Amino acid sequence: MGPLEFRDVAIEFSLEEWHCLDTAQQNLYRDVMLENYRHLVFLGIVVTKPDLITCLEQGKKPFTVKRHEMIAKSPVMCFHFAQDLCPEQSLKDSFQKVIVTRYEKREYGNLELKKGCESVDEGKVHKRGYNGLNQCLTATQSKVFQCDTYVKVSHIFSNSNRHKIRDTGKKPFKCIECGKAFNQSSTLATHKKIHTGEITCKCEECGKAFNRSSHLTSHKRIHTGEKRYKCEDCGKELKYSSTLTAHKRIHTGEKRYKCEDCGKELKYSSTLTAHKRIHTGEKPYKCDKCGRAFISSSILYVHKISHTEEKPYKCEECGKAFKLSSILSTHKRIHTGEKPYKCEECGKAFRRSLVLRTHKRIHTGEKPYKCDKCGKAFISSSLLYKHKISHSEKKPYKCEECGKAFKRSSTLTIHKISHTEEKPYKCQECDKVFKRSSALSTHKIIHSGEKPYKCEECGKAFKRSSNLTTHKISHTEEKLYKCQECDKAFKYSSALSTHKIIHSGENPYKCEECGKAFKRSSVLSKHKIIHTGAKPYKCEECGKAFKRSSQLTSHKISHTGEKPYKCEECGKAFNLSSDLNTHKRIHIGQKAYIVKNMANL
């Protein structure tokens, strides 16, 4: 018997046979052929890539390849799926019955593997010459191995146990470089190319290189925009079958993988692998630019983009560009208004699944992210990260315009808007414009009158979650934020920041009209109204307008007759706190007069 070649494990179909297979069977055929080819490459048997493999990688039908291009003239072993013999069988059965034909000189043999056979040795080969004599022989030259899940075509040199290992979940092949384990030696061989930097396939469109031809094939769909796989539940189209499989779990809510350490259930094995590193502290993926390490390669990939200014993904609606296609997809929902992720508890919908997961913790009370400095817990890692900055005095983010420094990059981004007059976010109700989308969202609540955030202590409701968070502090006497200069403590970090300006004497907020400077931006905003003469706050009862919201609030009391401000000395009540303060001076004057008279006695 000669050396094993690719044609010895090639699977061939006629046009009629191919059309007998459904889509799932055709996809399985393609996967089997590509995997068999990879096995032979790993063993060093195949040097040049056969046309059939190129055809399959490009998504073409196998019968379009000419026979002489796919299979050479020398002896051939072909596997024919007996779909025409058993059309009523399922996908599983169609791969459990295989006809093996051996072409050699003037003789050929037919081998039929019945359902239930462990290998060809249990079947019979009928060898027949031109003399019509039949003779039963036992096959020894090749074997077809059957797994309980489905039949996989495999040569004696490819090790039939490979498929069974995949079903058991064992990963005996370990990478010496990084310790990652695999269930197939061929997958390990492909993985090693990551460490060696070996590149075998290059995209003709953008020049991007890959160490797997299958990765190149998948990558090409970015340029073509092809989305072959459609979700039957929501109609969403996806580029890859693996992405469709993962996507379907959103609808089913299935979480197959459970962490043995904390009991957390996850939808994907890759997510479980990365999650386990939270418990071990392992961070094997290191950025070669800044040295920062991560628990998964995907997080490292996203992080690396932060080192480049390239933004190849552009929104056709507004022209805004992004570094990641996933961010662009999420961004597009701003224009469409689509919010596909809905909370089953309260009905609130979100554009991103991550935001929904974080939101659900509000209902469950779960706060898995804990600060190791003060013990405070949070519903998301981003909130914990922001909180940790409050313990640090570092301000690494500096404004190039005015030199002001900030602890957070997001705060710097918001600050930069103050240097421009552009207000791209417009309210559809009143045409008021804003510099930030968050400010527009907050403003919209004015029109709806909705106050969805309620305090559990006193029942008071708020329009913003941030206002509720701030309000909750009023129920506690704890003052976490301490001034290093005078040891004065505050309940709010913002109050501490404002207080610090007293020690510095700095007035960073300057009016462009008159040059007057202020310690707070809010005071500057109120001051600017003097120059504009605008009175944006209008009373719904009488139509009177005011420059400040606080003035409107005070005015509204005149319609209700309410007098919430009471003098402790004489019991007299007032509409306004300012009126109470003025009234108190009467009592102070009386006391001063009495003291003066007593001194003269």
UniProtKB/Swiss-Prot annotation:
Domain KRAB: 4-75
Major site of localization recorded for this protein: nucleus
Domain of life: Eukaryota
Gene Ontology MF: a single term: DNA-binding transcription factor activity, RNA polymerase II-specific
Intrachain S-S bonds: none
Cellular compartment(s): Nucleus
GO cellular component: nucleus
Name of a matching Pfam family: KRAB
Zinc finger motifs (C2H2-type), residue ranges: 173-195, 201-223, 229-251, 257-279, 285-307, 313-335, 341-363, 369-391, 397-419, 425-447, 453-475, 481-503, 509-531, 537-559, 565-587
UniProt keyword terms in alphabetical order: DNA-binding, Metal-binding, Nucleus, Repeat, Transcription, Transcription regulation, Zinc, Zinc-finger
Record-linked InterPro entries: KRAB, KRAB_dom_sf, Znf_C2H2_sf, Znf_C2H2_type
SMART domains, sorted: KRAB (SM00349), ZnF_C2H2 (SM00355)
GO biological process, one term: regulation of DNA-templated transcription
Keyword Ribonucleoprotein: no
Hydrolase as UniProt keyword: no
Family: Belongs to the krueppel C2H2-type zinc-finger protein family.
Role, per record: May be involved in transcriptional regulation.
Stored PANTHER family: TRANSCRIPTIONAL REPRESSOR PROTEIN YY, ZINC FINGER PROTEIN 143
Protein name as catalogued: Zinc finger protein 90
Organism listed in the record: Homo sapiens
